[in-house]
Regions:
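C-terminal regulatory/oligomerization modules of transcriptional regulators
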Residues: 1-2, 76-126
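Basic helix-turn-helix/winged-helix DNA-binding cores
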Residues: 1-69
C-alpha cells in the first residue's frame, strides 16, 4: 500500500472505528497524521503499521497510559530504543504471566469436563 488512506478507509481496513482513531490521535497514540487542504485526515502506510502495533498492545492488556508513554518515547526517536525495549519486556512478562494464569484455569476446566465425562460413563453403565 503506497498511497494515503482516509479515516474511513483506515477504519474499514483495520476494524478500528473512526471515533477510536480520533481518540487515539487526541491521546497522542497516533502522531503526525497528515491532513488534506480541507483538513481531512490522511494516514500513511507507516501509520497503519503503528496502529496495528497499538492494537496489539491494547489487546494484550497494556493500559492507555502505558501506550501513551511508549508512543512518547517512540516520538523521541532512536535514542529511546532501550527504554522502549524495557517497556516491552515488562509488558511481555505480564502477558506471559496472564497466559500462565489462563492455562491453569483452562486445565482446571478441562479436568472438570473429564470428571463429568467419566461420571456420565459410569452412570450409564451402571
Amino acid at each position: 500500500m503506497s498511497k494515503a488512506l482516509t479515516i474511513g478507509q483506515v477504519a474499514a481496513t483495520s476494524g478500528v472505528s473512526t471515533h477510536t482513531l480520533r481518540y487515539y490521535e487526541q491521546a497522542g497514540l497516533l502522531r503526525s497524521i497528515g491532513r488534506t487542504d480541507a483538513g481531512h485526515r490522511l494516514y500513511a502506510p507507516g501509520d497503519l503499521d503503528w496502529l496495528q502495533f497499538v492494537m496489539r498492545l491494547k489487546a494484550t492488556g497494556m493500559p492507555i497510559a502505558g501506550m501513551q508513554a511508549f508512543a512518547a518515547l517512540r516520538a523521541e526517536g532512536d535514542a529511546t530504543f532501550g527504554a522502549r525495549r524495557a517497556m516491552l519486556i515488562e509488558h511481555r512478562d505480564a502477558v506471559l504471566a496472564r497466559i500462565a494464569e489462563l492455562q491453569t484455569n483452562l486445565d482446571a476446566i478441562s479436568d472438570k469436563i473429564a470428571f463429568y465425562e467419566a461420571a456420565e460413563r459410569e452412570a450409564s453403565t451402571g
